Curated annotation (Swiss-Prot):
This is Manganese-dependent ADP-ribose/CDP-alcohol diphosphatase. Monomer. Its EC number is 3.6.1.13, 3.6.1.16, 3.6.1.53. It comes from Homo sapiens (Human). It catalyses: CDP-choline + H2O = phosphocholine + CMP + 2 H(+); ADP-D-ribose + H2O = D-ribose 5-phosphate + AMP + 2 H(+); CDP-glycerol + H2O = sn-glycerol 3-phosphate + CMP + 2 H(+). One of its GO terms (cellular component) is cytosol. SUPFAM superfamilies: Metallo-dependent phosphatases (SSF56300). Its cofactor is Mg(2+). Belongs to the ADPRibase-Mn family. Zn(2+) 2 binds at D74, N110, H241, H278. The lineage of its organism: Eukaryota, Metazoa, Chordata, Craniata, Vertebrata.
């Protein structure tokens, strides 16, 4: 039985304000097809670039063009580093993105750090922090240079926030640095396995090397931005490579301190949805506080005859994801206004 909602049929109920594109885990490499670590799922390394091309052509030809595209991380595969092809593969993907007629906001995932150091990424075309919007007279909403996160306003009364899920991580960091030592200590405290990418026997399986977490500094900043959005009655979309809600994700793929991120988000009224990648399988759930968690299906594990991307149409009362291929359609109604008591 197909209970998939039909956004086209429901879109007449209110005027569309704007739209934006979403895509995750392209993981391009100029290699023949392979499999995941367990050898159970095929990965289409070379064809992923053609999927990206198809998505860009689709967005460019939409009757109401998206205002921007959110790229949810893992844009090239870690295998590139083994073949000394990281820069070349990134250049091919970025050349493809040049065909897109709207801005793209890039999130960083584990595969970015398999290929490049954090310092390299900070000075690369994958750093789209220059697209941020600064809130005048509110310095507390300015992100630190210590992590890669920012916010922007695609449309009045809507704010998008990109988070750095590898702010706490042993990936892409100088191994002689205090930050590396701090993050390795966190990882070792929760994961005694010799192979740190293995969740075997862990009570908290998210503590593996291919995941990361949010520093307290970044969470404090997120809290300040959400406080501003609450006060100014903005609707907020949050983006991260790593998911933070267990019901929408494999537990092995969650951010290390996902509970801390949820605690911040749940203390505010303004957040509509949280987009993530990383799982490749996709996932979806509405949490008890009315926040929708959308984990996008990964391009890398999408067969040549399918697709994996979407366009989110934004209305005064809801957001509607129109998926392509493996990505299902979703309807995300805004929370009903709660009464404020003095």
């Amino acid at each position: 039985m197909d209970d998939k909602p039909n956004p086209e049929a429901l879109s007449d109920s209110s005027e569309r304000l704007f739209s934006f594109g979403v895509i995750a885990d392209v993981q391009f490499a100029d290699l023949e097809d392979g499999f995941n670590f367990q050898g159970t799922r095929r990965r289409y390394y070379r064809h992923s670039l053609l999927h990206l091309q198809g998505a860009i052509e689709d967005w460019n030809n939409e009757s109401s063009m998206p205002c921007c595209v959110l790229q949810l991380g893992d844009i090239i595969d870690g295998y590139n580093a083994q073949y000394n092809a990281s820069k070349k593969s990134l250049e091919l993907v970025m050349d493809m993105f040049k065909r897109l007629k709207v801005p793209v906001h890039h999130t960083w995932g584990n595969h970015e750090f398999y290929n490049f150091s954090r310092e390299y990424l900070t000075h690369s075309k994958l750093n789209t922090k220059f697209l941020e919007d600064q809130i005048v007279h509110h310095p507390e909403t300015m992100p630190s240079e210590d992590y890669y996160a920012y916010h922007f306003v695609p449309f009045p009364k809507f704010r998008f926030i990109l988070l750095d899920a590898y702010d706490l991580s042993v990936l892409g960091v100088d191994q002689s640095s205090p930050k590396y030592e701090q993050c390795m200590k966190i990882l070792r405290e929760h994961n005694p396995n010799t192979e740190l990418n293995s969740p075997q026997g862990l009570s908290e399986p998210q503590f593996v090397q291919f995941n990361g977490g949010f520093s307290q500094e970044q969470l404090n900043w997120l809290n300040e931005v959400l406080t501003f959005s609450d006060t100014n009655q903005e609707k907020v979309v949050i983006v991260s490579h790593l998911p933070i809600y267990p019901d929408a994700s494999d537990n092995v793929c969650l951010a290390w301190n996902y509970r801390d991120a949820l605690a911040v988000i749940w203390s505010h009224e303004c957040v509509v949805c949280f987009f993530a990648g990383h799982t490749h399988d996709g996932g979806y759930s509405e949490d008890p506080f009315g926040v929708y968690h959308v984990n996008l299906e990964g391009v890398i594990e999408t067969a040549p005859d399918s697709q994996a991307f979407g366009t989110v149409h934004v209305y005064p009362d809801k957001m509607m994801l129109k998926g392509r291929g493996r990505v299902p359609d979703r309807i995300m109604n805004y929370k009903k206004e709660r009464a404020f008591h003095c």
